[in-house]
Amino acid sequence: DPQLLPFVNLKAPLVLYLLDRRLCKMGASLGLGRVIPKLFLQAITGEMTQNALGTHSFLRTCKKVSGADLRLFVDQWINGSGCPRFLCTATFNRKKLLIEMHVRQESPAAIYAQAHPEDALASNPVSLWEGQMTVRIHEADGTPYEHVLDIKNEHQRYDVPFNTKYKRVRRNTKRFQARQAAAAAAAAGDEDAAEAIGMIDLGFGLGMWEDEDERKRWRVADWTEEDEAIMASAPYEWIRLDADFEWMAQIQFEQPDYMWVSQLQRDRDVVAQLAAVHALSQMPSLITSSTLTRTVLVTKYFYRIRAEAAYGLANCALPHLDLLGLFHLFMLFRTSYCLDVPHEGDSTSLEAPCIPKPNDFSDMADYFVRRALIHAIARVRDHRGRALVIVQRFLIYLLRYNDNSTNRFVDDYYLASIINALAGTLIPIDSAGYSTHADETYSAEAVSYTHLRAHETG
């Protein structure tokens, strides 16, 4: 079926990946790495029926090599349809010194099949998913401890033992002088200070924000004393669910923002960083905006993580936050890609003009981050769902003053992305009859520049 083939091509490699992870967990350390040579050998010796690999013969070979019982896996991921959704919570029990985890699962495919049986005649939705899920808890001593949850019911509580009786040492994000003092003490031979510094992962540090004046210029938010007290009393750093990628599922897990910040700054796994960025994007605050801005600035992050952080800043451009997310987006773009233009007011003001530097696309990671910043700025809306005038003016300036004369790469796709972003600002989220003279003026100018650039590039 040509309509079904794209879905099969998408699901098949994912199921094979899950099978490889399961085989590794069941004792076959090489997973499919031991199965594939057997299949090649069967093809060479002519043992393979009609020289074609079938599902049953493949699974039989997997069972013969690993000795694992794959019937449950086959029923759920090959013969069955759908994917689970897990809703998880974690609570620390100080009396028993353990973490109580509640896992509730849902099967959207089964729910849909019950509500629309006529549309699910050919499907075989799985109503209850079973298997093991790895939970990685980063405790106070900085050591990640892995625990395995055996999922068998729709709702189940797990008592996860806690290993560390250690009062944690956290980074004090608003007092960089403390880090400098600790470093000086460590250099002088203070073993306790050296140990404290060793527990801090400085791989994603940002030296620019060590200067107090720079922090003020960037409006960097710091944790309050209440936040720091809560953080100091927290028993663990953060928790990751399905750390070994054994499930093709949607996992919803809630933890405080400071734990997501720790995960983003201290976990070197790109998937963990992405999960932290997405979670923080749904928790807009001054701290979130500063953290995501720092993520964009630190070039050691994978460029797509930096791009996702830029998109998350658009969610922090809220009136009650004084549009801090938009301010940080403008600061990021002006600092890296704009000329220093004299301005009567504050050079960091949202009203300050943005005149771009000549294009330089030699750094491809930086190029994609640049495009992400442009689209993130274009996503900012006011409480009526309309794009801000300063956003449209910013995009118009990018088109008007674009200079590609010294760039060794063409800027066609770059200009197209700006035009696309500018066109998006003309579409309100809620188009219920709201307009002002300023909106109409800049919208008309935006439309004219869009048509002009489209004519020039066409």
Residue ranges of model-derived segments:
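Helix-start/N-cap signature of alpha-helical segments
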Residues: 265-273, 301-309, 322, 362-370, ...
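Residue-level signature of the C-terminal ends
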Residues: 282-283, 315-320, 379-384, 421-432
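Short sequence/structural elements of tandem HEAT/ARM alpha-solenoid repeats
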Residues: 287-295, 322-332, 386-394, 432-445
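Conserved small/polar residues in nucleotide/adenosyl-binding loops
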Residues: 450-457
